[in-house]
Amino acid sequence: MLQIKQICKQYKTGDLVQNALNNVSLNLRDNEFVAILGPSGSGKTTLLNIIGGLDRYDSGDLIINGISTKKYTDRDWDSYRNHTIGFVFQSYNLIPHQTVLANVELALTISGISGAERRRRATEALEEVGLGNQLHKHPSEMSGGQMQRVAIARALVNNPDILLADEPTGALDSETSIQVMELLKEVARDRLVVMVTHNPELAERYATRIVTLKDGVIRSDTMPYEPDTQTLAAPVHKNMGRSSMSVLTSLTLSFNNLRTKKARTLLTAFAGSIG
């Protein structure tokens, strides 16, 4: 269970202070599809970023399965993001010169998993999103909907407890948007999915719960959850696990990147010489 307790967040620019979130409290079930709905500037993306550990709250607490994050170090936050959270954004953030399989495998490189196991799990994740026959394609050879499916597979390959989606259909046509939403609905059967959207129709059609934000305050919640506080233990601090890739893995990735760029440069030079 994820608990958001009286979280406040401000952004300061010179003398200007913007209240992004104001005493936001929310309890989220382990498996539900929550849509965070609201206009631009309502605080919904800030809330999503705080849940994902991409941004820090000023006050309050974020409690994950009874673990308080108040005393989290940078390393704890890194490990939390890598082991607990899967991210899906409007932009797919795929590496263009890597194959689809390699893009998904990349999410596992910091976990110390063997190459064979990475390949097996990445293949499994791509099969789960309907791309089992596209493993060796590059992003440039795929449609927008297919690339978003790759991004979802990459988010799921670590088997995270929570999947966060920020406007996942924003760059897609209506037909492809429906396919992606159906996939997210399926994913939410056995984990928590939190999606930020401007689109009330998508939220009402696919989400099991809609939380509406405006001016940094929760205005409505279609299915609030109040756990039995008598059965909950007091939140504690706990150090997270490994959050960085090995030196060998870093060098391998760098070498592959340089090799690809070198090949491109040679091909360009050759084409220019005969052109």
Functional labels for PLM-detected ranges:
Residues M1-Q10, R219-T249:
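ABC-family P-loop ATPase nucleotide-binding domain
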Residues I210-T222:
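H-loop (His-switch) and adjacent beta-strand-loop-beta switch element
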Residues L2-T197:
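ABC family nucleotide-binding domain
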Residues A203-R205:
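A short, surface-exposed alpha-helical micro-motif characterized by mixed small hydrophobic
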Residues K238-S273:
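N-terminal Sec/SRP start-transfer signal
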